Amino acid sequence: MGLFDLLKKKPASENVLADAQPEQNLQPVETQQKGAEPYLGDLEKTGAISELVKTPHSGRDAAWQKEFLQIVSQASFQCGDPQVISGPDGFPYFQLFLPEPNQQFQCYVIDRMKDDFLLNLGYAVVINPVGEQPDWVFTYGDIVNLHVNHIFYTNDETAFSKNRQDEVIQSKEKVLIGQPSEYILPLATRQVLRSFLQANGISVPKVVLMQRQDQIKSHISQDLVFNITPENFGNEEDYRAVMQHLAWFLPRHYAYAGMSENALPEFEPL
């Protein structure tokens, strides 16, 4: 197969498989290194979160969400018991709850947790998972974005492609192939992705960063491309499910695709 191969994009929406992560990931974690300073969150922001979550889910508009997201990473939380649960999507989530008034608690702060263990262990975060609906759910990819961009969600224009459908690279396009930097894929995230793909039958997961320029419109876009094709799976459904799962590991504005190794000799192991 030549370079002008079919770029198999993730589907826009699709059901995902259960048990997306190995169960051994659901273990208590040592959250702080010995001798390190304990987490100290911002109790004022904790109080603000406590007031915000009193608003029913139906009333949480854009202004509510903006305020919540601006302060939640610095607020103080306590962990659940167990610390980590398997979500309905099969992925591991570290449980955080608002502390009880006038009671001592071990403090957890998302901004500290992300670098101490969330990124390395492949954990997402769920806030107040009680009742029918938690107050907020952050995927692992949201935590990655907090690490690299200091915000959970990037809504500004980026170089990543907005196309989520399968594509064919046109002969008039300029294509540049390289490796994603640490800023795009941190080392810890590479390792987490590698473990996930190996658990799903990709023995040597590989990746490239593909930049494409449309000579007619002079538009430049980029995609992460993994060595994943339907031929790696027993059927198209399993392939599509794994491709959909990848979205959980990546910031939401990232675009990614699968392509045969025969089409891209520049692939390198994750």
Residue ranges, per PLM feature:
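An interfacial alpha-helical scaffold signature
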Residues: 2-270
